[in-house]
């Protein structure tokens, strides 16, 4: 079998997710063809699929040593840096790939995703629109453009491009889920009828059927057929849970470790003045009202709503891994705190924030409140809480874009909520004056009073 046929066979196995087989065959083929840039790039892509980031980067770089103008390898290396939150290096590489080939659609798409991460949505939209002029029937470009418009509240454009996605690829169900957010369904709605057919379509894989189940749950709820709504919510959650690897004990043990780390820390005696930067962290359980609080505060002329930033979590978890045996060293060594603080500031400095006060709305930052106090003593922390049953049910009936894996099984969701509640109580005992707690229901029922109190806590003038 010649190399072309071997690669074709390998790509077929890659497409069905048989990555162990692909790695074995690619290593063998690459050994026989050590100067083949394409093989090194494909090997790197396969390592990415099995989450071996280091090996992926090595092979992408080897591919580029063999062929510095291999735009696919440049693009893949840029994606790896982007996923590792090294946005500066990722941007440099995307620009390099597009310099070699200005019409490289994958590069335009991935660079647009980086721009969205950096809250530069207008530039992301420009990149996607350019890509669509090159490949007008590329359904992923239309879907990505719809998501970009969604992030800036242009819902008419979102729906238009989601519908175009399905026109090109009727089986791409994430577009169904996106459309469902903007329709108040009736039983004769054509999209509703389409989804009822699609759920029994054997050509649609389980990952896509998850999206249809959640969309149908919302549709049946709109129509008022609650038994069917619950059925599809249950099916969607069960199917999603079967497709992910997750152990609730990992999260619970992490929260226990955090409490142990901070148990004997007296913040009144420890002067962690590492950074004088002012910023706002809005946190709590997902679906507790954090988005509403962010919308209110980011409408202020001096506040920049940065969305859910991954930076703090990644920086702290990296230090956890490096200090597994003596986690308290993270706190007790000033140099560690300075490195972590600088890393966060460096990441947020890339955002297009016009020198405004940055608001980080990652709900799960409740895990890191003690770290925030140590790293940024002038920060403002707002904890949003909501009725536990309402919070958990809202989590359960929503499909999340990010990895909130505890939300797809009722028992795991309850265990996570209890651990969250315990940790928040711990932080309130330790750092009561540092945390402003607000109830979602109070904000809804008495907005004027609560908005004024929020602004006062953040030291912002009423506008």
Residue ranges and their predicted role:
Residues 225-340:
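PAPS-dependent sulfotransferase catalytic core
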Residues 11, 38-49, 72-83, 105-117, ...:
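Conserved alpha-helical positions within TPR/SEL1-like repeat arrays
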Residues 15, 49, 83, 117-118, ...:
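Register position in tetratricopeptide repeats
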Residues 152, 166, 303-306, 311-334, ...:
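PAPS-dependent sulfotransferase catalytic domain
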């Amino acid at each position: 079998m010649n190399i072309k046929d071997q690669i074709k066979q390998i790509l077929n196995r890659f497409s069905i997710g048989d990555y162990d087989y692909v790695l074995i065959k690619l290593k063998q083929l690459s050994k026989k063809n050590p100067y083949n840039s394409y093989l090194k790039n494909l090997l790197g892509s396969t390592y990415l699929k099995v989450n071996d980031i280091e090996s992926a980067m090595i092979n992408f770089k080897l591919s580029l040593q063999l062929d510095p103008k291999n735009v696919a390898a440049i693009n893949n290396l840029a994606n790896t840096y982007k996923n590792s939150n090294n946005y500066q290096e990722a941007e440099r590489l995307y620009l390099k790939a597009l310099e070699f080939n200005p019409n490289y659609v994958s590069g335009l798409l991935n660079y647009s995703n980086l721009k969205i991460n950096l809250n530069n949505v207008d530039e992301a939209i420009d990149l996607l629109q350019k890509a669509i002029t090159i490949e007008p029937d590329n359904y992923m470009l239309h879907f990505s453009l719809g998501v970009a418009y969604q992030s800036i509240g242009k819902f008419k454009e979102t729906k238009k491009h989601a519908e175009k996605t399905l026109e090109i690829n009727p089986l791409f169900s994430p577009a169904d889920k996106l459309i469902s957010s903007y329709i108040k369904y009736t039983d004769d709605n054509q999209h509703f009828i389409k989804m009822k057919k699609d759920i029994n379509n054997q050509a649609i894989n389980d990952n896509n059927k998850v999206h249809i189940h959640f969309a149908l749950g919302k549709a049946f709820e709109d129509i008022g057929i609650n038994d069917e709504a619950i059925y599809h919510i249950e099916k969607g959650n069960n199917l999603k849970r079967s497709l992910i690897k997750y152990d609730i004990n990992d999260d619970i043990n992490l929260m226990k470790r955090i409490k142990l780390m901070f148990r004997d820390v007296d913040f009144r005696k420890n002067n962690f003045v590492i950074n004088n930067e002012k910023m706002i962290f809005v946190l709590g359980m997902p679906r507790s009202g954090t988005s509403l609080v962010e919308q209110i505060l980011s409408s202020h002329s001096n506040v920049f709503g940065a969305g859910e930033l991954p930076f703090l979590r990644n920086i702290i978890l990296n230090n956890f891994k490096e200090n597994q045996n003596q986690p308290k060293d993270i706190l007790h060594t000033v140099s560690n705190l300075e490195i972590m603080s600088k890393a966060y500031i460096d990441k947020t400095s890339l955002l297009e924030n016009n020198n405004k006060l940055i608001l980080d709305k990652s709900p799960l930052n409740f895990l890191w409140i003690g770290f925030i106090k140590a790293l940024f003593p002038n920060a403002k922390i707002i904890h949003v809480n909501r009725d536990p049953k309402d919070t958990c049910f809202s989590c359960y009936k929503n499909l999340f874009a990010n990895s909130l894996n505890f939300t797809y099984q009722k028992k795991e969701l309850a265990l996570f909520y209890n651990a969250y509640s315990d940790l928040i109580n711990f932080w309130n005992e330790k750092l009561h004056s540092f945390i402003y707690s607000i109830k979602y229901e109070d904000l809804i029922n008495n907005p004027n009073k609560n908005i004024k109190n929020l602004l006062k806590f953040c030291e912002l003038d009423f506008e």
